């Protein structure tokens, strides 16, 4: 399956191609990764904040999920991002961006640029959403947001070394 986005948010529970996820919210982005994995980005704004989750599945089996919670409004940035992994799964990156962003790219420890699948602007959340799996054996070290080829925001490598230990970080 090619990565896809939804022009409108889709229910996260019981809607094809989305398996029943242990999360509330709506699906905004879906894509495939290595080893038969599928990722689904869901968004929930029912608590007055915006909870953005990346869920990983293999077929109908839910494997893992994690994400971030924050204000519905951007404060001094156009990029909010998350990167993580668990156990034997590859790294994943996910971002929430302002409408002006036209491209999101993660650069790995080996110098590979991975372009994230980017949703259209979703007015109900005031954001665009992006996600991608990172190639096997590589780790996301920097993430940048671009507008028409010009970098407008970056999120450098966190304080941990790249690649960090697989346990205790991410999912």
Enumerate the language-model features and the residues they cover.
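Ser/Thr-rich low-complexity repeats and stalk/linker segments
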Residues: 86-91, 98-171
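Solvent-exposed, non-transmembrane segments of extracytoplasmic/periplasmic domains
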Residues: 1-90, 153-154, 159-166
